[in-house]
Amino acid sequence: MMPSRTNLATGIPSSKVKYSRLSSTDDGYIDLQFKKTPPKIPYKAIALATVLFLIGAFLIIIGSLLLSGYISKGGADRAVPVLIIGILVFLPGFYHLRIAYYASKGYRGYSYDDIPDFDD
């Protein structure tokens, strides 16, 4: 007969608990702990990166046209700030779109976790 366990808090023996032996082939692991959950795709952050990329590209094109003289509304004194703002807006958009693209293709070292999310 198996000995009954004692509840330490009250000192009352508990005989209603049923015990069963584990299988000798069980190594203590379950399959679920090795399954990888699908990545959460940050759609809002990717949309924002796309908007930054497009606005930055547009400003770079406009700044280049202003600087070269195809658009004659002020010359170089207006072209340089437009180019600088275009580059500053373009770079983060390009960077995060590149990470999103490589993560979607499954390249090693890239994941959606590298893109900042809005915690919704």
Curated annotation (Swiss-Prot):
It is found in: Membrane; Golgi apparatus, trans-Golgi network; Cytoplasmic vesicle, Secretory vesicle, Synaptic vesicle; Early endosome. It is a multi-pass membrane protein. GO terms for biological process: axonal transport; synaptic vesicle transport. GO terms for cellular component: autophagosome; axon; early endosome; endomembrane system; endoplasmic reticulum; late endosome; membrane; recycling endosome. InterPro entries: TMEM230, TMEM_230/134. The modification Phosphoserine is found at S15, S23, S24. Keywords: Cytoplasmic vesicle, Disease variant, Endosome, Golgi apparatus, Membrane, Neurodegeneration, Parkinson disease, Parkinsonism, Phosphoprotein, Synapse, Transmembrane, Transmembrane helix. Changing Y29C: In PARK; uncertain significance; sporadic case; results in decreased synaptic vesicle trafficking. The chain crosses the membrane at residues 46-66, 79-99. It is linked to Parkinson disease: A complex neurodegenerative disorder characterized by bradykinesia, resting tremor, muscular rigidity and postural instability. Additional features are characteristic postural abnormalities, dysautonomia, dystonic cramps, and dementia. The pathology of Parkinson disease involves the loss of dopaminergic neurons in the substantia nigra and the presence of Lewy bodies (intraneuronal accumulations of aggregated proteins), in surviving neurons in various areas of the brain. Involved in trafficking and recycling of synaptic vesicles. Belongs to the TMEM134/TMEM230 family. This is Transmembrane protein 230.
